[in-house]
Amino acid sequence: MTEHLLAMNQKLKNPDEALSLFGNQDSFLKLMEKDLNLNIITRGETIYVSGDDESFQIADRLLGSLLALIRKGIEISERDVIYAIKMAKKNELEYFESMYEEEITKNAKGKSIRVKTMGQREYVAAMKRNDLVFGIGPAGTGKTYLAVVKAVHALKNGHIKKIILTRPAVEAGESLGFLPGDLKEKVDPYLRPLYDALHDVLGADHTERLMERGIIEIAPLAYMRGRTLDDAYVILDEAQNTTPAQMKMFLTRLGFGSKMIITGDVSQIDLPKGVKSGLAVAKEMLKGIDGISMIELDQTDVVRHPLVAKIIEAYDKQN
């Protein structure tokens, strides 16, 4: 193998830039070495690569793309590097860079929220384009989080008056009346992921204030019956655990000026044996209807710990 001096368009300007690009203790470079079968050596702000010409070219483009993002003030994470490597191997780095061009909104700490994968980009675009969107895929793909982010963004911009978040309490058989405690105590354990997303985007205090004013409503699916939801962003989470009747009931609540986002994972159905999933039925029945988007995410869109994607892939192969 031939040692190359990696020829970048611009040299690294300072140690801080090098740290952002290389990762803590060169962790990002180690990921590249492993995935691209290279040896990468750094001397100050200069990079040397030992590997074949093809791998060298991939690494050159990869580091150039990451550096371009860093110079735009975007903080690079391990997940970003892993996804960038995949895109570089497919010669699709221009799409990787373009994902970071649009900020959806900022979280409670003022940090920019952006899509992290091409699948997420398609999902967010669908939510902008259509009033009814299904986000279907495994855990960790950002289905629920991005739906909440878009809902908050719509509320901040005055496009809607209310956010409604719901999910079936299938673990309790939707029979919450048989559980001890008041409604909030009964419902909260099943809706915790929705609270977590809201707290990240709005902060816990702001979320509570909006809930007290009725601007944000979090409730079990059974409480949607008989309502028409106008000027609202309505999110149904864990939709794989609805029955077809529950799904129909929910979808027909859609009112004027509203959007509905339905998220779920058809591989994680917890319904009693023999009961069909409302999400699985809707996925087939509503496919191709104008104004409805069916977005399917997969393990390449997982934005949790890198091992999560590998675990999902292993189980998918088994099934």
Curated annotation (Swiss-Prot):
Record-level Gene Ontology MF annotations: ATP binding
Location(s), subcellular: Cytoplasm
UniProt key word Transcription: no
Domain of life of the organism encoding this protein: Bacteria
Primary localisation category: cytoplasm
GO cellular component, one term: cytosol
UniProt keyword annotations, A-Z: ATP-binding, Cytoplasm, Nucleotide-binding
Residues binding ATP: 137-144
Keyword ATP-binding in record: yes
PANTHER family attached to this UniProt entry: PHOH-LIKE PROTEIN, PROTEIN PHOH
Family affiliation: Belongs to the PhoH family.
Name the record gives this protein: PhoH-like protein
Gene, per the UniProt record: phoH
